[in-house]
Amino acid sequence: MSEIVPPEVRPKPAVPAKPSHVAPPSSAPFVPSPQGTGGEGQGSGRGSALLGYIGIDTIIEQMRKKTMKAGFDFNIMVVGQSGLGKSTLVNTLFKSQVSRRSTSWSRDEKIPKTVEIKSVSHVIEEGGVKMKLTVVDTPGFGDQINNDNCWEPISKHINEQYEKFLKEEVNIARKKRIPDTRVHCCLYFISPTGHSLRQLDIEFMKHLSRVVNIIPVIAKSDTLTPEEKTEFKQRVRKELEVCGIECYPQKEFDEDMEDKSDNDKIRETMPFAVVGSDKEYQVNGKRVLGRKTAWGVVEVENPNHCEFSLLRDFMIRSHLQDLKEVTHNIHYETYRAKRLNDNGGLHPISSSGHDTQESNL
């Protein structure tokens, strides 16, 4: 009889020890816990030191490079009566001839019976960043004896740009980058009467502040004394408040206390009392943009003379991206929701087809 050999006894694999504490699921991003700081489970959570450099902060540089390569669109509309220096101010803001210069009507010419919409686009490059700037002018606004509802063509144009963007969004063969012709900012020029807003001013801002970012400015403010300017600005702010008109930046869209603090200062400054000029003068050994008067040169960028630099810094240097975001996230989304609700939704549009539904806005 053969000898029975007992089966070989193999060592059992080690069973990992059950953790003494199981952390609940968290939506916080994973952060490695530091080594050598104590017992198990310590050093986890937000604010813990990283073991080494990861590189997540390079996302800012990545975004910057993509923006510089692609560029961006910025569309500004100027509205106001003829002769208030709309084109000059826009050209001064962007330091180039970007706006068509309005011409004064001669006796032989007829003033347009309705408001016209004319736009011109330019590509501006600064520091490697390209911006396609489109300036939308509205000749004929407020120039009639009867100006009833003269804001309607402007409102129609703004909504048409929302409609154009919406149709591109629902297109089956949607472009990788949808051309953006939506109006991001409307500069509304108030005549420097020194008295109060006209009914036309109130009606325009009341209707248009619902669909576009309005920034009111007092044109040719050098025609007012400092005292008249201060009183006029206070009166305009009071009238806007009484009429329930909220210009940009609207209080309800302040994201945090820092935003609120910064925007409150801007709201207290509005309307901006501005002067525009494309002419240079020698002042104290320096070349400055300004307007020559009997009392001297009004320097455009001197904050003691006017608020042009405040307007420029606000509109371009601190709030340009926010103007675009409020346009997309608030005004356009409001239009989009109403459009879809009123028409039972939009069906996708093929590259060869057309959506026959028209906007009721």
From Swiss-Prot:
Origin: domain of life: Eukaryota
BP GO annotations: cytoskeleton-dependent cytokinesis; protein localization
Keywords for this protein: Cytoplasm, GTP-binding, Nucleotide-binding
Record InterPro entries: G_SEPTIN_dom, P-loop_NTPase, Septin, Septin3
Annotated Polar residues bias: 349-361
Record domain Septin-type G: where: 70-342
Region described as G3 motif: spans on this chain: 137-140
Gene3D superfamilies: P-loop containing nucleotide triphosphate hydrolases
Pfam families: Septin
Record: residues binding GTP: 80-87, 114, 220-228, 276, 291
Region entry G1 motif, spans: 80-87
GO molecular function annotations of the record: GTP binding; GTPase activity; molecular adaptor activity
Region of interest: G4 motif: 219-222
Gly residues: bias regions: 36-46
Entry's Gene Ontology cellular component terms: cell division site; microtubule cytoskeleton; presynapse; septin complex; septin ring
Subcellular location field: Cytoplasm
UniProt KW Nucleotide-binding keyword: yes
Biased composition (Low complexity): 15-34
Annotated segments matching region Disordered: 1-46, 341-361
Record PANTHER family: SEPTIN (PTHR18884)
Assigned protein family: Belongs to the TRAFAC class TrmE-Era-EngA-EngB-Septin-like GTPase superfamily. Septin GTPase family.
Known function: May be involved in cytokinesis.
UniProt name for this protein: Neuronal-specific septin-3
Organism: Danio rerio (Zebrafish)
